[in-house]
């Protein structure tokens, strides 16, 4: 091989089966893929340590909720107030956030139908927020 060419090892990702990612300095974190549904299409969300990233979700099988217990941070989609056939609306996202019970929840993947950020944010519980471009979250 040529110097500097990265070596890649492909690993199969299996929903519900954790794997470890890390860097050369030895920092490692466990990642657990989660089954979620984008309408009728199965996709994956991820629990990454004490944080989870779930986007493009409409529904999630009941067993996956068990894998999300004890989260500090949940990042999840909330498209708009009205129902949609492939994404959670605001009520569905709020219901799922309450069921999961993370310390803080951040909604992403919102459309302009959600309204102005400051106005819409006032409708959320204190531990739930609309994320924004450039936002930083401490883990």
Please provide the spans of the model-predicted regions:
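A general structural motif
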Residues: 34-38, 55-62, 85-88
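Binuclear metal-dependent hydrolase catalytic cores
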Residues: 1-54, 119-139
């Amino acid at each position: 091989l040529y110097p500097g060419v990265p070596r890649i090892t492909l690993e199969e990702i299996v929903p519900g089966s954790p794997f470890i990612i890390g860097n050369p300095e030895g920092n490692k974190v466990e990642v657990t893929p989660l089954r979620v549904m984008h309408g009728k299409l199965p996709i994956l969300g991820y629990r990454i340590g004490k944080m989870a990233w779930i986007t493009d979700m409409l529904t999630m099988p009941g067993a996956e909720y068990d894998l999300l217990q004890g989260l500090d941070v949940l990042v999840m989609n909330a498209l708009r107030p009205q129902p949609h056939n492939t994404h959670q609306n605001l009520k569905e996202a709020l219901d799922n956030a309450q069921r999961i019970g993370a310390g803080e929840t951040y909604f992403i993947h919102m459309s302009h139908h959600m309204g102005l950020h400051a106005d819409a944010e006032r409708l959320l519980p204190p531990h739930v927020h609309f994320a924004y471009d450039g936002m930083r979250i401490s883990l």
